[in-house]
Regions:
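Extracellular/periplasmic metallocenter environments
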Residues: 447-455, 510-586
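Short amphipathic beta-strand segments in non-cytosolic proteins
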Residues: 501-503
Length: 586
């Protein structure tokens, strides 16, 4: 049986990854039409793409690391396991898409989570059996242990996710969310990633590295993960931070060895600095940086109830970049056909490689820094689009490699040195984009430009404002003319929002669960406010401040800080209530 026939099962098992990638790109183009679209896009990536990839490649590398090839008659059952997994993923996403349709939607999500968790639990047992049956003393056996730990984490993360879908009163909901992220990103993805990179990093950089402290690395990661997840579940921020630091120390051990690989290659780069190489080097750095940020936030918010989760750096900087970089290298290697054929496939995947790698990493950093909504949109397109190009390149790479194998075309020649001019070009594109939007700093984000706080009646009206379901509640506020308006703004939605007024008062970007105090200024005339996040105003996220010129509440020289209480006359629907009128209590 030839090599292409032997890997037929592998190509079939990888089809769900391709389908989910294509679906993610298409859905992102019309995401505004979906309910809870941010959750849907994130979980299409994490469940659809990442989970299928980890289950496939952990099986692939377990066989390689243990030198124990499974018989071909086991492959049909493996394909059925992928089918079962994807049924569970579809159920989870369906449950969340029907969230606004009926209250018991979480039952669908819970069933899906059970199927997904059960699939990975079985996968962990399957890998464990292979480990026990293999010969002892295999060099990369610790990486197989990492795959088993990875597969054991997802059922626990799925359980936390099902509990989130059911809904628990605070602070349990916030605790479950942080636990869910720690188990799934640091546990499921983290163990699989570090376990694979023990071999793949030096292979992709085409140099040698020592593999000496893998047991210590995985022991520290395990201790850190268990500690952080337990601390998150019980609301102990310092324990979470301590666990994250232990996890960070664990992954720094191999990163130091990988850094030596990079230094060695840069002394004589030749054709070795590619998109895949830069991606697998940058992804662990994003993981380290994000761990530091999350540990700091957990330590400074001891109850963990308001910890802002750095989701995008985890998912894009670490998980997505690592996945695309690794696949750009191992897919041609898996097809095989000799050095020239494999090199041709890799070179096709590396088209504009350094240009794309720069857009991903520098573009993502700028995207996370700026609060300018439309600039964030453009930068996100550049960063994620540079990764999505993988889908376009795949058929060309496969066709070119098979052409060399079948001797219908010549192999592509090696480059003599890295194309560093691509880095310059990418930086120039980013600089042009940023300059066209007036720079990274949004001039109106400070909340003070143009705001008048002196004069008027000397009195202050304070109002609590909620943002949820692409609406402000209340969306009309009446304030005595001459009073200063101070808002306590809370984002109770599942996506980021902000609030900006005609006079320049601006909350800045607010993540879900965040709360800010905004001094709007003295109200002398009616004034409009809106959410500046791209597309939100067009969907109706606007409000009005009306100046009451009747004079009934004016007068008095002393500063009074009343509290505005909003009493609805009918049940609130979708987080809004047009009947709310401020009642000033002195």
């Amino acid at each position: 049986m030839n090599r292409l026939a032997k890997t037929a099962w592998h190509r079939k098992a990888s089809k769900p990854v391709t389908v989910w990638m294509a679906a993610l790109v298409l859905i992102s183009l019309v995401h505004w039409a979906l309910p809870n679209y941010r959750w849907v896009l994130i979980h299409m990536f994490t469940l659809g793409i990442v989970t299928n990839s980890i289950m496939l490649w952990s099986q692939h590398f377990t066989e390689k690391f243990l030198h124990h090839q499974l018989p071909e008659e086991t492959r049909p059952w493996q394909l059925r396991r992928f089918a079962i997994l994807n049924v569970g993923i579809l159920l989870i996403i369906t449950g969340q898409l029907t969230k606004d349709m009926f209250a018991q939607h979480w039952h669908i999500t819970a069933v899906g989570a059970t199927v997904v968790g059960g699939s990975l639990a079985f996968h962990a047992g399957y890998l464990g059996r292979q480990y026990l049956q293999a010969k002892r003393g295999q060099r990369y056996a610790p990486s197989v242990i990492a795959y088993i730990c990875s597969a054991c984490c997802l059922p626990l993360g799925a359980l936390a996710g099902a509990a989130l879908a059911a809904g628990f009163p605070n602070p349990w909901q916030e605790r479950l969310l942080l636990t869910h992220l720690i188990l799934n990103i640091l546990g499921f993805v983290g163990f699989a990633a570090i376990g694979s990179l023990m071999l793949l990093f030096p292979a992709i950089w085409r140099t040698q590295a020592h593999y000496e402290r893998a047991p210590l690395t995985f022991a520290l990661m395990s201790i850190g993960l268990t500690t952080a997840a337990g601390g998150a579940l019980f609301g102990q921020g310092l324990i979470v931070a301590g666990g994250l630091v232990a996890y960070l120390i664990g992954i720094i051990i191999p990163i130091m060895s990988w850094g030596a690989c990079v230094v060695t290659v840069l002394r004589d780069p030749r054709d070795r600095v590619t998109f895949a190489a830069v991606s697998v080097a940058a992804a662990p750095l994003w993981l380290c940086g994000t761990l530091i940020v999350l540990a700091y936030r957990a330590a400074t918010d001891l109850g963990t109830t308001a910890v802002s989760l750095p989701t995008m750096p985890f998912l894009i900087g670490f998980a997505a970049q690592l996945l695309i970089g690794v696949m750009s290298n191992i897919l041609p290697s898996n097809i095989g056909g000799g050095p020239k054929a494999t090199r041709t496939g890799m070179l096709v995947y590396d088209r504009a490689g350094l240009f794309r790698a720069t857009l991903v990493n520098v573009g993502l950093a700028c995207w996370l820094y700026t609060e300018n909504s439309w600039l964030r949109v453009v930068l996100s397109i550049l960063a994620m689009g540079s990764l999505a190009v993988f889908l376009v390149l795949t058929p060309f790479a496969v066709r070119a490699q098979l052409g060399v194998i079948r001797k219908t075309r010549e192999p592509l020649p090696l480059a003599e040195k890295p194309k560093t001019n691509q880095i310059t070009a990418a930086l120039a594109v980013l600089a042009l984009v940023i300059a066209s939007f007036g720079g990274l700093v949004d001039g109106g984000s400070g909340g003070s430009s143009g705001v008048v706080t002196a004069g008027g009646t000397g009195k202050t009206t304070e109002v609590a404002l909620d943002m949820k379901g692409l609406r402000f509640s209340p969306d009309v506020i009446t304030v005595p003319a001459g009073n200063q308006l101070v808002l306590t703004v809370r984002n109770s939605d599942t996506m980021a929002h902000d609030l900006k007024f005609d006079n320049g008062a601006h909350t800045g970007r607010m993540n879900p669960g965040e709360q800010k105090r905004l001094e709007v200024g003295v109200i002398s005339a009616d004034m409009a406010g809106w959410c500046t996040i791209a597309g939100h105003r067009a969907q109706g996220m606007e409000m009005t401040v009306k100046a009451d010129t009747s004079g009934g509440s004016a007068g008095g020289a002393d500063t009074v800080r009343p509290t505005s209480v909003h009493k609805p006359t009918h049940p609130i629907q979708n987080g809004t209530d047009d009947s709310l009128e401020p009642i000033t209590e002195r």
